[in-house]
Amino acid sequence: MQYPEAISRLIESFTKLPGIGPKTAVRLAFHVLDMEEDDVLMFGKALVSAKRDISYCSICGNITDKDPCYVCSDKHRNRTIVCVVQDSRDVIAMEKMRDYQGLYHVLHGAISPMEGIGPEDINVSSLLTRLQADEAITEIILATNPNIEGEATAMYLSRLLKPTGIRVTRIAHGLPVGGDLEYADEVTLSRAMEGRREL
């Protein structure tokens, strides 16, 4: 069927979102047409605001609307431990657990040779710079996802960090292999943190 151009553009825009196929995009586009104009305008403003106002923390790489982020700014956090995660959604998942009181470092990805992603393509160099600048850090917890890419990233980082003398641990595999941190419940994450091991 031929849609009006404005609807076609809206459908095409929705299909660019992860997990949204053509049929879902059509449903969403027609839902937008049924919404009140004020709600559509608020939705559009929220999208633009999120894109414009959210940036990355200059210390840890987490998403934030102020620099440094709320975690790096919190003086009550344990500044001797840094938990390395793949993306900002993992920070949110860890924070829901409420057991971990250290700092974070967000890689913004994982090593994946099949996709042409190497260590230089993720936030590794800033981690090394951070470790050289902050002598208070005594432990790095590698909390990358328990899949092939996450394991490859953890092994790479453990080998890279060993010469520094900083303790390097890996979260335990209370998480399902092939799963993502952001989908784990608080109890599973808590057990995984308690069962972390030396690498």
Curated annotation (Swiss-Prot):
List the InterPro entries hit by this protein, alphabetically.
DNA_Rcmb_RecR, Rcmb_RecR, Rcmb_RecR_Znf, TOPRIM_dom, TOPRIM_RecR
Q: Which GO terms describe its molecular function?
A: DNA binding; zinc ion binding
Q: Which residues form the Toprim domain?
A: 80-176
A Pfam family it matches: RecR_C
**Coiled-coil stretches noted in the UniProt entry, renumbered to this chain:** none
Q: Where are the zinc fingers (C4-type)?
A: 57-72
Q: Name one GO biological process term.
A: DNA recombination
Enumerate the UniProt keywords alphabetically. Answer: DNA damage, DNA recombination, DNA repair, Metal-binding, Zinc, Zinc-finger
Organism's domain of life? Bacteria
Q: Which NCBIfam families match?
A: recR (TIGR00615)
For this chain, the family text in UniProt reads: Belongs to the RecR family.
Q: What does this protein do?
A: May play a role in DNA repair. It seems to be involved in an RecBC-independent recombinational process of DNA repair. It may act with RecF and RecO.
Under what name is this protein listed?
Recombination protein RecR
Tell me the organism: Exiguobacterium sibiricum (strain DSM 17290 / CCUG 55495 / CIP 109462 / JCM 13490 / 255-15)
